[in-house]
């Protein structure tokens, strides 16, 4: 088209999600980790659980993930003093760990600065798939990775390059007002958070078998491709 239109980037993002939902393999990655300890789970025990590769594509198959006493979970998925309609992890409340068991949060541990370093819970052994209470309903489901069966990863989160909706018109206005070059004007509207690098994340080992395809894709580092990945 020759029409000079301005489209919301949210339309592009929505189309990308729709495309990837139909073909991208699902894996778990924890980008802001806090340790979750299942206090009544046997120490040293490891289970292999089935994870569906793509719920929208039955032919995509599945892969195995390890489950153990100590897991990494998202820090954002825990709140010590939660509001009434909070359905993630909080003391006294049950949630399901994706592809695994229902657990009930029993508390947390903090450091000298009040930062939560560990979250504690107890699991119900009868809630794993195939067990008597497997279909018991809870309102929250959380993703996780096993502490001893995952890879450390550097995650790079990309956001919008510009702070304004219409950079072309904004650049013209800045140049007119300040009588400056385009490059100088660009510096005023570039989003400083367009790239966030998170160095201490964790991801399933299965991720290293995947080609660069999904919304989060793998970029192997040259010095330790078998131990560390960049997502």
For the regions a language model picked out, list residue spans one by one.
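Core subunits and conserved enzymes of cellular information-processing
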Residues: 6-219
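N-terminal leader/propeptide and maturation segments of large enzyme subunits in energy/redox metabolism
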Residues: 1-5
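Cytosolic catalytic cores of cyclic-nucleotide second-messenger enzymes
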Residues: 231
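Conserved small/polar residues in nucleotide/adenosyl-binding loops
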Residues: 220-225
């Amino acid at each position: 088209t020759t029409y000079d239109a301005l489209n919301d980037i949210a339309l592009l993002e929505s189309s990308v999600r729709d495309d990837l939902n139909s073909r991208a393999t699902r894996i778990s990655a924890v980008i802001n980790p806090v340790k979750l300890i299942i206090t009544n789970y046997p120490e040293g025990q490891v289970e292999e659980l089935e994870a569906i590769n793509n719920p929208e594509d039955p032919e995509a198959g599945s892969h195995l993930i390890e489950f153990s006493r100590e897991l990494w979970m998202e820090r954002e998925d825990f709140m010590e003093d939660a509001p009434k309609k909070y359905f993630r992890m909080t003391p006294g409340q049950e949630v399901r760990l994706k592809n695994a068991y229902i657990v009930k949060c029993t508390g947390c541990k903090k450091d000298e600065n009040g930062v939560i370093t560990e979250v504690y819970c107890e699991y119900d052994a009868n809630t794993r798939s195939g067990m008597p209470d497997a279909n018991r309903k809870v309102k929250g489901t959380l993703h996780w990775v096993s502490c001893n069966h995952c890879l450390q990863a550097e995650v790079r989160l990309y956001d919008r390059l510009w702070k304004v909706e219409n950079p072309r018109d904004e650049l013209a206005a800045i140049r007119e007002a300040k009588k400056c070059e385009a490059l100088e004007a660009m510096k005023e509207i570039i989003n400083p958070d367009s790239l966030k690098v998170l160095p201490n994340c964790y991801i399933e080992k299965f991720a290293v078998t995947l080609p660069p395809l999904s919304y989060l894709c793998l970029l192997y580092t040259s010095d330790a491709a078998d131990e560390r990945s960049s997502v």
